[in-house]
Amino acid sequence: MKASLLNKLDVLSDRFEELTALLGDAEVISDQTRFRAYSREYAEVEPVVALYQQLIRVQGDLEGAQALLKDSDPDMREMAVEEVRETKQQLVELEAQLQRMLLPKDPNDGRNVFLEIRAGTGGDEAAIFSGDLFRMYSRYAERRGWRVEILSENEGEHGGYKEVIARVEGDSVYGKLKFESGAHRVQRVPETESQGRIHTSACTVAVLPEPDEQQAIEINPADLRVDTYRSSGAGGQHVNKTDSAIRITHLPSGIVVECQEERSQHKNRARAMSWLSAKLNDQQTSAAANAIASERKLLVGSGDRSERIRTYNFPQGRVTDHRVNLTLYSLDEVLAGGVDAVIEPLLAEYQADQLAALGE
């Protein structure tokens, strides 16, 4: 293992001892904010240090086995050869595990997200495909026990959505969906196509982590224009009686968000403000992410919304992710919510990129 990584592990071991002492300190215990912060850090550091201690023990075992290779007893030497082989293999596996654990954590991975799906080129077909994508993500969320809440929707004339915005809540939502941002292309024969010709349409997907209070950008109320209107969404007669829907325009950036699904104007406003904060955060961070990805020539993780990331070919039953040259002939399963078949190879590729950078 590289000296730089061993140095990191030594630093973490020292920090682990510090945290152990701090969590037993009466002054820290009485301060719940500090106690929770140290507890979270302890939970992150402890498994790494435990694995590092195991690595050190196995290294000691290897040294002992290597010493036995010089034993005068041939049977002992034979046993030592086998032990050296097994111990070296164990060390390789432990080092690989530790390298993965040392990869930089994305602080947003555990967050809820705002999912934005918009029809692009292709007119009615693009809107119908937006509906297909929204159902795909909704079914995936259902499989993972997440909750999907539509904030705003603009339905297509022949089904689907011209635009649909949802909030997805659950464990590690952003960590799973963060590489879904980009242009999704569909190739299929529309029902109205009498000649059987394949049409190509596209939709864009954006996945924005929902910021917490610490992350939320401070927004000057003077920079906002707030409009109320009557919701066109679900909600029965009540929707027609009150102007509960909210549209907020951030004047400096021109960003517009709206929420119309809640019956309470107060709830709609709170959701819209959270979404606006996510979009402003994304605006700040995406430029930096693109620069890093470009510098390291990364295909996964750039988050470029204009990048064509995936093609769904209905006649062939094929899904192709262009970033990792992945092709699957299981379109129906993917659209039914089996998105992990595409997501897991992307996460593996991203992790490989991180490991390469860690070793530089």
From Swiss-Prot:
GO terms for molecular function: translation release factor activity, codon specific. Its main location: cytoplasm. One of its GO terms (cellular component) is cytoplasm. It is found in: Cytoplasm. InterPro entries: PCRF, Pep_chain_release_fac_I, Pep_chain_release_fac_I_sf, Prokaryotic/Mito_RF, RF-1. Transmembrane segments: none annotated. Keywords: Cytoplasm, Methylation, Protein biosynthesis. Methylated by PrmC. Methylation increases the termination efficiency of RF1. The modification N5-methylglutamine is found at Q237. HAMAP family: Rel_fac_1. Belongs to the prokaryotic/mitochondrial release factor family. PANTHER family: LD18447P. Peptide chain release factor 1 directs the termination of translation in response to the peptide chain termination codons UAG and UAA. This is Peptide chain release factor 1. It comes from Pseudomonas savastanoi pv. phaseolicola (strain 1448A / Race 6).
